């Protein structure tokens, strides 16, 4: 267990914003989890759980508490199709491991930044797959009850980019130590999600093995999304919008695409509002994918907040819809 003091939050998050954290503790073993929490408790400091920082925004005032960095590694088979993966593993490394074993279930989650421990928190998903489709349970440390617990999928209240881990009274209560998933030997078959289907048709792909799907998804994602080491970004910055039937009909009458489940792609809204490539207070809307906000020159959270509010206002005036931020704020 490594304890560091006065650490720059911008060096822990991919948007590269944020002041100082009082303490940052790197967790390398399961035993470190309880020790680190007790350290925070003894110092009467709040705790924030962080993985790679790809879905977290730091604030200018920093964090006067303890950031716990989950770096606990390990992947093991429980049986032929069931895997336990430790929370500090990179999600993409887990996807690579499973596709090499020709197992299906998470191959479309390739190239999503972040850790295994963060996957259930956000119920991460892409190209028609979501972690809840394969998730069985998580092993976690309950910061409130100060004990290790196993939480089954049906008790996680999983939804679109949400769970008990980031919503409601239990948000931030659990540090996910490991995740158990159950995969399959079945493979995905066409038709696929729009951009993946277009790729298949353009390149006349006939191999739909997990490894092949992973290769396609990775190429598509990196053709659109900035790599964190090259550009400061949190990936998709706005959530897609879900509507009731009446609102969905209103949007259809405006020739706005409404997908299955009355989902409206926020990227389309931003693009068709003419915001692609536009800069606001040092933040730029990506030319390749309108959902992406890139930190070009913003030096503070205040700049990001101003940019976000201006984009949200433009979309509200044009479509009557309110965009919601996807990354959580460190506070």
Question: In which residue ranges do the predicted regions lie?
Answer:
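Generic structural marker for isolated residues within well-ordered, non-membrane alpha-helices
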Residues: 95, 266, 312
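Anion-binding (especially nucleotide phosphate/pyrophosphate-binding) glycine-rich loop
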Residues: 1-138, 142-144, 155
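Generic non-transmembrane alpha-helix signal with a bias for helix starts/N-cap capping motifs
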Residues: 33, 91, 263, 308-309
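Phosphate/pyrophosphate- and phosphate-bearing ligand-binding catalytic cores of soluble enzymes
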Residues: 4-5, 11-14, 56, 148-303, ...
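A common structural junction motif
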Residues: 44-46, 200, 312-319
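Beta-rich strand-turn-strand
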Residues: 103, 301-307
């Amino acid at each position: 267990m490594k304890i560091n003091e006065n650490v720059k939050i911008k060096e822990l998050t991919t948007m590269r914003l944020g002041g100082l954290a009082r303490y940052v503790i790197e967790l390398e073993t399961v035993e470190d989890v309880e020790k680190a929490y007790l350290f925070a408790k003894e110092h009467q400091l709040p705790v924030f759980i962080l993985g790679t920082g790809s879905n977290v925004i730091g604030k200018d005032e920093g964090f006067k508490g303890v950031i716990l960095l989950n770096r606990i590694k390990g992947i093991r088979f429980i049986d032929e199709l069931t895997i336990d993966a430790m929370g500090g593993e990179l999600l993409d490394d887990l996807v690579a491991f499973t596709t090499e074993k020709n197992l299906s279930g998470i191959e479309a989650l390739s190239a999503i930044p972040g850790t295994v421990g963060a996957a259930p928190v956000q119920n991460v998903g892409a190209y028609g797959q979501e972690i809840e489709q394969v998730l069985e349970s998580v092993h976690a440390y309950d910061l409130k009850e100060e004990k290790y617990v196993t939480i089954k999928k049906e008790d996680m209240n999983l939804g679109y980019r949400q769970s008990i881990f980031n919503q409601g009274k239990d948000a931030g209560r659990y540090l996910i130590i490991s995740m158990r998933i159950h995969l399959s030997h079945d493979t995905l078959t066409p038709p696929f999600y729009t951009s993946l289907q277009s790729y298949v048709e353009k390149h006349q792909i006939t191999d739909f093995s997990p490894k092949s799907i992973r290769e396609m998804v990775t190429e598509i994602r990196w053709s659109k999304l900035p790599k964190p080491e090259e550009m400061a970004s949190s990936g998709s910055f706005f959530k897609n919008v879900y509507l009731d039937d009446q609102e969905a009909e209103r949007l259809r009458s405006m020739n706005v695409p409404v997908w299955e489940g009355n989902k409206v792609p926020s990227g389309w809204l931003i693009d068709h509002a003419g915001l692609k490539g536009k800069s606001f207070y040092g933040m730029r809307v990506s030319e390749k994918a309108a959902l992406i906000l890139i930190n070009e020159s913003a030096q503070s959270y205040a700049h990001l907040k101003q940019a976000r509010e201006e984009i949200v206002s433009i979309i509200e005036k044009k479509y009557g819809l309110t965009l919601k931020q996807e990354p959580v704020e460190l506070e």
